[in-house]
Amino acid sequence: MVFKNSIDLYKKAVELIPGGVNSPVRAFKSVNREAPIFIKKGQGAKIWDEDDNEYIDYICSWGPLILGHNHPKVIEEVKKIIENGSSYGLPTKYEVDLAELIVDIVPSIEKVRLTTSGTEATMSAVRLARAYTQRNKILKFEGCYHGHSDALLVKSGSGLLTEGYQDSNGITDGVLKDTLTLPFGDIEKVKEILKNKDVACVIVEPIPANMGLIETHKEFLQGLGKVTEKTGTILIFDEVISGFRLALGGAQEFFGITPDLTTLGKIIGGGYPVGAFGGKKEIMDLVAPVGRVYHAGTLSGNPIASKAGFATISYLKENPNIYKELEEKTNYLIDNIEILAKKYSVNVCVNSMGSLFTIFFVDIDKVENLEDSLKSNTENFSIYFNTMLENGIVIPPSQFEAHFLSMAHTKKELNRTLEVIEMAFKKIGEKSGK
């Protein structure tokens, strides 16, 4: 493959944009690439770069494109909106339609407020929890990523792990002192922290996907529900990734556990910028202009994102078998990946839930938290990534992210993916002398 146009664009970009990208993981630095690939179009399960290289895509815009790229039902609806205008700074029926659909489907949400990003949604949900409880402290889990607001950018996952750190400069000690962190999955330590009844909220990814995918034990989430209820602490499920992907009603439907507040993003915008936070009416009615918890946004409830999200979720609702089909595709890949790993004596642990999975290059049986994830052999991951990319398969450029499948991925594309994974594992096995 030739990458000249992408390399030239990157050289230009680094003179104009910090690091040449608008989100750090996109720079491809952790996988030892000279430049990232610059994308010009997508269709179905495939994308094409500026050098006209074709790829089977397992990033899917980091999760929103559960139907695949450029799905006709979504594009058709978006075109209708664009013909009338892009944004008005005033309400439209489309945001009401989307809100009604979300409230109808997501178990915990009685009222919802739309935002323009997942970061904005989690930041606002934490503010709301503090106002409702009249407490300042919050509890999050190591390796879970909830966007880049100051209070939540502590022992975080996603791009921070990719860059080799877990916190950010520029966050004051005053902010940091109110953010408590614990290892994911340790309910006894949660009980110890919450017993003083001075923590406003516990925020958690019900399926962590930003330290690589972690397979959640239902008992841990049930434990969080019980201890937060007992201590008057707000339980926030960050379902920006899992919402409408693990099941139509998200992880809370999948596990049968109802939080107090939920944050959403990605799929609810159908590939356009969006976020949302919602929950119990008595809590949500503290949000301005009803209450004094302020949230606003020039593009909140944007008609294009609202209509794209409505079209996507409506399609999912009308075709409930999609979730079973996606899980079957994922399991087909995983079963064969594990066979190939044994064939070439490559140490891996493959975690999956629904249509998400991560191949951890580790010499342990199970990856269950950040400490386990950090044992990954990132050199082996780099070989895996580069072999895939150079043979027409694009995956997240980080050991600490999840692969995403869409309904557009075909058996033929899955089999081609396995052929290239075999190439990668063979290289890794030869390097290790096995």
Curated annotation (Swiss-Prot):
Q: Which reaction does it catalyse?
A: (S)-4-amino-5-oxopentanoate = 5-aminolevulinate
Instruction: Specify whether Cytoplasm is a keyword of the entry.
Output: yes
Q: Please state the pathway this protein functions in, per its UniProt record.
A: Porphyrin-containing compound metabolism; protoporphyrin-IX biosynthesis; 5-aminolevulinate from L-glutamyl-tRNA(Glu): step 2/2
Q: Has UniProt tagged this entry with the keyword Transferase?
A: no
Pfam families to which the protein is assigned, alphabetical: Aminotran_3
Q: What class of enzyme is it?
A: isomerase
For this protein, what is the EC number? 5.4.3.8
Task: List the cofactors.
Answer: pyridoxal 5'-phosphate
The entry's cellular-component GO terms read: cytoplasm
The UniProt entry lists the main location of this chain as cytoplasm
Q: Tell me the keywords, alphabetical order.
A: Cytoplasm, Isomerase, Porphyrin biosynthesis, Pyridoxal phosphate
Q: Which GO terms describe its molecular function?
A: glutamate-1-semialdehyde 2,1-aminomutase activity; pyridoxal phosphate binding; transaminase activity
Any single biological process term in GO: protoporphyrinogen IX biosynthetic process
The record's InterPro entries line, in alphabetical order, gives: 4pyrrol_synth_GluAld_NH2Trfase (IPR004639), Aminotrans_3 (IPR005814), Aminotrans_3_PPA_site (IPR049704), PyrdxlP-dep_Trfase (IPR015424), PyrdxlP-dep_Trfase_major (IPR015421), PyrdxlP-dep_Trfase_small (IPR015422)
Q: Supply the NCBIfam families for this chain.
A: hemL, PRK00062.1
Q: Which family does it belong to?
A: Belongs to the class-III pyridoxal-phosphate-dependent aminotransferase family. HemL subfamily.
PANTHER family, A to Z: GLUTAMATE-1-SEMIALDEHYDE 2,1-AMINOMUTASE (PTHR43713), GLUTAMATE-1-SEMIALDEHYDE 2,1-AMINOMUTASE 1, CHLOROPLASTIC-RELATED (PTHR43713:SF3)
Know the name of this protein?
Answer: Glutamate-1-semialdehyde 2,1-aminomutase
Q: Which source organism does the UniProt entry give?
A: Fusobacterium nucleatum subsp. nucleatum (strain ATCC 25586 / DSM 15643 / BCRC 10681 / CIP 101130 / JCM 8532 / KCTC 2640 / LMG 13131 / VPI 4355)
Taxonomic classification: Bacteria, Fusobacteriati, Fusobacteriota, Fusobacteriia, Fusobacteriales
Q: Which gene encodes it?
A: hemL
